[in-house]
C-alpha cells in the first residue's frame, strides 16, 4: 500500500522543455501568434504534463465525492439531509446535472461514497469513512488519521483510474451543508474573515446568512486549524467529500495528468492540495467562476483564472464537465490545425 509521502514524491513540475516545444509549434500554426488566447496557454500547460502524450485526451472522468456533514445539525442548510443519498442514487441513474453535462462532454462519472449517512448504495464506489463527519461547530470533522487515510485512498483510486486509461480528471462533490466547511477552509487558508467566504450554497435564505457566518466563525475558533498544514485544516474544519477531492488532485498530479476543478467546494480542496504539495497547482484547470461569495477570494489565493463565467453554483462537478469541452478544443487545435509553412504564408513575428 502506498503512503502519502510516496504519492507526494512522485509529483513533478511541468516539463518546461516540452512546453517550449509546444509554444514553438503553436506559433507556427495557421494563425497570428497568440490569437487563440488562453486556448493556446491551455495547450501549453497540457504539453508539460508527463502523463499525456500527443495531446490525446480521449478518456475523461469526473470523480464525485459524496458525504454528509455533522454541521448540518446547526441549521446551515435547507435541503433534507437524505438528499445526499437520493442524489447519489440519481447519479447512478445518470439523471443529475453533472451526469447529463458529462455525457455531453464524453466524460464518465464515478460516484464515491466517502461518508454518506446510509447503508451501502448500489452502483456507488464504497470508500465510506463514517456516516457523516463530525460537527465542526463543536469539534473536529474527523481525526488526522482518517484524513490521511482518505487522502491515500482517494489518490490511489485516481492512480488506478489513470493506469486504466483515463487522461483527464474532473472533481465534483455531493453533500448537504458542505458549503459551510468549505467556507471555513477558504477562510482559514486565505486568512479571510468568514463573512467574506460564506455564501448561500443551495439557496440558503440570505436573511439567515449571519447565522451561517457565526457557525463558520465558531468552527474555526473551536478547532484552531493550522493554516500552514493542509491536512490539519481538512481534519478539523473540512469534510470527507472535501478530503476526497483533495486526494483526487494529489493522485492526478502524481500521475502527471490534468484535473479540472469545479466550483467553490473544489477551490477549498485545491487550497488544501496546494498547501500539502505546491506543485499540484501546475495540474489544475479552473473551469468556471462559482457564484458563491468566497469564490474570488479562493481563486485569487490560488492564482487561478477560471475559463467560464456562467453564474453557476450547482456543484456536483457540473462546471468541470463544461470545461472538458475546452480541454478537447485545445487538443484539437494543437493536433489538427495546419501550419503556416504548409501554406507558404509568412506573418510578421510568426514561426514557419
Swiss-Prot record:
The keyword Glycosyltransferase applies. The active site is at residue 316. It comes from the Bacteria. SUPFAM superfamilies: Nicotinate mononucleotide:5,6-dimethylbenzimidazole phosphoribosyltransferase (CobT). Signal peptide: none annotated. GO terms for biological process: cobalamin biosynthetic process. It catalyses: 5,6-dimethylbenzimidazole + nicotinate beta-D-ribonucleotide = alpha-ribazole 5'-phosphate + nicotinate + H(+). CDD domains: DMB-PRT_CobT (cd02439). Gene3D superfamilies: 1.10.1610.10, 3.40.50.10210. Keywords: Cobalamin biosynthesis, Glycosyltransferase, Transferase. One of its GO terms (molecular function) is nicotinate-nucleotide-dimethylbenzimidazole phosphoribosyltransferase activity. Pathway: Nucleoside biosynthesis; alpha-ribazole biosynthesis; alpha-ribazole from 5,6-dimethylbenzimidazole: step 1/2. It is an enzyme of class 2 (transferase). InterPro entries: Nict_dMeBzImd_PRibTrfase, Nict_dMeBzImd_PRibTrfase_bact, Nict_dMeBzImd_PRibTrfase_N, Nict_dMeBzImd_PRibTrfase_sf. Its EC number is 2.4.2.21. Belongs to the CobT family. Catalyzes the synthesis of alpha-ribazole-5'-phosphate from nicotinate mononucleotide (NAMN) and 5,6-dimethylbenzimidazole (DMB). This is Nicotinate-nucleotide--dimethylbenzimidazole phosphoribosyltransferase. It comes from Yersinia enterocolitica serotype O:8 / biotype 1B (strain NCTC 13174 / 8081).
Amino acid at each position: 500500500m502506498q503512503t502519502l509521502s510516496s504519492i507526494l514524491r512522485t509529483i513533478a513540475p511541468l516539463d518546461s522543455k516540452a512546453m517550449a516545444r509546444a509554444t514553438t509549434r503553436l506559433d507556427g500554426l495557421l494563425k497570428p501568434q497568440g490569437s487563440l488566447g488562453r486556448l493556446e496557454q491551455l495547450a501549453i500547460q497540457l504539453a508539460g504534463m508527463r502523463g499525456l502524450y500527443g495531446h490525446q485526451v480521449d478518456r475523461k472522468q469526473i470523480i464525485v465525492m459524496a458525504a454528509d456533514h455533522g454541521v448540518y445539525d446547526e441549521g446551515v442548510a435547507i435541503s433534507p439531509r437524505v438528499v445526499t443519498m437520493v442524489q447519489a442514487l440519481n447519479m447512478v441513474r445518470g439523471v443529475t446535472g453533472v451526469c447529463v453535462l458529462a455525457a455531453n462532454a464524453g466524460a464518465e462519472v464515478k460516484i464515491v461514497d466517502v461518508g454518506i449517512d446510509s447503508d451501502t448504495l448500489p452502483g456507488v464506489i464504497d470508500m465510506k469513512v463514517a456516516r457523516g463527519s463530525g460537527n465542526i461547530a463543536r469539534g473536529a470533522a474527523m481525526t488526522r488519521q482518517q484524513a490521511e487515510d482518505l487522502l491515500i485512498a482517494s489518490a490511489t483510486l485516481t492512480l488506478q483510474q489513470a493506469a486504466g486509461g483515463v487522461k483527464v480528471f474532473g472533481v465534483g462533490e455531493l453533500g448537504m451543508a458542505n458549503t459551510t466547511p468549505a467556507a471555513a477552509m477558504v477562510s482559514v487558508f486565505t486568512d479571510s474573515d468568514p463573512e467574506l467566504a460564506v455564501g448561500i450554497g443551495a439557496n440558503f435564505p440570505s436573511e439567515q446568512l449571519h447565522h451561517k457566518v457565526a457557525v463558520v466563525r465558531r468552527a474555526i475558533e473551536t478547532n484552531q486549524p493550522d493554516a500552514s498544514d493542509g491536512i490539519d485544516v481538512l481534519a478539523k474544519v473540512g469534510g470527507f467529500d472535501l478530503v476526497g477531492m483533495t486526494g483526487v488532485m494529489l493522485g492526478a498530479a502524481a500521475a502527471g495528468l490534468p484535473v479540472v476543478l469545479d466550483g467553490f467546494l473544489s477551490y477549498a480542496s485545491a487550497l488544501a492540495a496546494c498547501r500539502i504539495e505546491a506543485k499540484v497547482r501546475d495540474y489544475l484547470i479552473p473551469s468556471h467562476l462559482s457564484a458563491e461569495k468566497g469564490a474570488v477570494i479562493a481563486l485569487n489565493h490560488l492564482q487561478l483564472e477560471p475559463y467560464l463565467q456562467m453564474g453557476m453554483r450547482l456543484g456536483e462537478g457540473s462546471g468541470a464537465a463544461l470545461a472538458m469541452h475546452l480541454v478537447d478544443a485545445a487538443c484539437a487545435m494543437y493536433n489538427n490545425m495546419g501550419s503556416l509553412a504548409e501554406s507558404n504564408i509568412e506573418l510578421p513575428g510568426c514561426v514557419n
